Amino acid sequence: MKNNKKAFEEACEYIAGGVDSPVRAFASVGSNPLFIKKGKGAYISDIEDNTYIDYVQSWGPLLFGHCDEDVEKACKKALEHGSSFGAPTLAETKLAKFILQDWPHLDKIRFVSSGTEATMSAIRLARGFSKKDKIIKFEGCYHGHSDSLLVSAGSGAATFNTPSSLGVLEDVAKNTLVAIYNDIDSVKNLVEKHSDIACIIIEPIAGNMGLVPAKKEFLQELQALCKKHQILLIFDEVMSGFRASYLGSYGIYNIQADIVTFGKVIGGGMPAAAFAARAEIMDLLSPLGGVYQAGTLSGNPLAMASGYASLKKARNYEGLYEKLEKLGKRLTQGLKEAANDCKIPLQVNCVGSMFGFFFCENPVNNYQDALKSDTKLFAKFHAQMLSKGIYLAPSQFETGFICESMDKKIIEKTIQAAQESFKTL
């Protein structure tokens, strides 16, 4: 049996960088990645048969943990009839109706296979609807790896109007304006200078600079500004949708965006995402309108079955989100108390089943605040926690997730591990 180090060395021979998504390489924490062979509930096991409490949960999709029986059953039943047809199925309509019933400002939806596709398509749709070119995004918010949105992204350099990746053309980046998260004046300044803004896209609960929720007043002012200047407001709820609450940020702030993107939880662990809006906007999509979007595996029956099973269970589970939030708040409270006992500065954020923490003195409200976190200290903490069986995201600038399979005992075990880890820093 290979160990993790040898498995990574072999992967690097055949897979670019040894991984299919950069953060998985553990580069930011200075170690080798774990190769996971199985998971059940709140736990995962690597190829060396080490078991960990998993706070990554596949980066958010697994609301009920690994191998949930209801989701597995739905997938197996769907697979009996075929994995993909490239044709309409009743499963797509079933999931679409189920999602839209609770979002009064969204009339129609279209499924895709990834969050990147969802946000990319939403931007194209907004430009097609408004007949304007420029967009505004926020420093530190990540909306996938399409060219227009890889500007001052969560993982890139915080530089105004500068691509965060080689291969992104300056001619593309120049149409992406960057504002400061939770700072309405920075948005107003851009709107005053540019008359051709098609849309403003934001993570209302940002999860890619660590967890940083928007302030309600800021979102209210943002919505008012968009209405005043006829700019479409896009809420990227790929991470927060059905996670922060059943209705994502809408269930918390009660603010309606013009276009909303979904992902992660709506696939229940299978590749699925979506974007939705009122009919006037959505009917511009081909084949009805002139905005083109397509995908071979979009709406595939396995993902639709998995997503429906997960969302139906979440919607019908009385007290689910209260339980998850209670566990999340206890965890972050325990982490902060443990850090304080060791005189280590730690800021914590928790929204529903999403949480984050930063090794810095002051509260984190935007990307520049997040960058003040001591990433070297985080790397040491991450290694200590991993050695104690706690699997955290291998980056300071990622969000952690609570799943339904977790309980108070698991949370207290994690806090105990943190107490021991802080003492070594």
UniProtKB/Swiss-Prot annotation:
PANTHER family given in the database record: GLUTAMATE-1-SEMIALDEHYDE 2,1-AMINOMUTASE (PTHR43713), GLUTAMATE-1-SEMIALDEHYDE 2,1-AMINOMUTASE 1, CHLOROPLASTIC-RELATED (PTHR43713:SF3)
Quaternary structure annotation from Swiss-Prot or TrEMBL: Homodimer.
Documented EC number(s): 5.4.3.8
InterPro entries named among the record's database cross-references: 4pyrrol_synth_GluAld_NH2Trfase (IPR004639), Aminotrans_3 (IPR005814), Aminotrans_3_PPA_site (IPR049704), PyrdxlP-dep_Trfase (IPR015424), PyrdxlP-dep_Trfase_major (IPR015421), PyrdxlP-dep_Trfase_small (IPR015422)
Pathway info: Porphyrin-containing compound metabolism; protoporphyrin-IX biosynthesis; 5-aminolevulinate from L-glutamyl-tRNA(Glu): step 2/2
Superkingdom, natural source: Bacteria
Positions carrying N6-(pyridoxal phosphate)lysine: 264
Lineage of the species this protein comes from: Bacteria, Pseudomonadati, Campylobacterota, Epsilonproteobacteria, Campylobacterales
Cofactor(s) needed: pyridoxal 5'-phosphate
Name used for this protein in its record: Glutamate-1-semialdehyde 2,1-aminomutase
Entry similarity comment: Belongs to the class-III pyridoxal-phosphate-dependent aminotransferase family. HemL subfamily.
Subcellular location: Cytoplasm
One CC-aspect GO term: cytoplasm
Top-level class of the enzyme under EC nomenclature: isomerase
GO MF annotations, alphabetized: glutamate-1-semialdehyde 2,1-aminomutase activity; pyridoxal phosphate binding; transaminase activity
Main location: cytoplasm
Keyword annotations: Cytoplasm, Isomerase, Porphyrin biosynthesis, Pyridoxal phosphate
Coiled-coil region(s): none
Gene Ontology process terms (BP): protoporphyrinogen IX biosynthetic process
Catalysed reactions listed for this entry: (S)-4-amino-5-oxopentanoate = 5-aminolevulinate
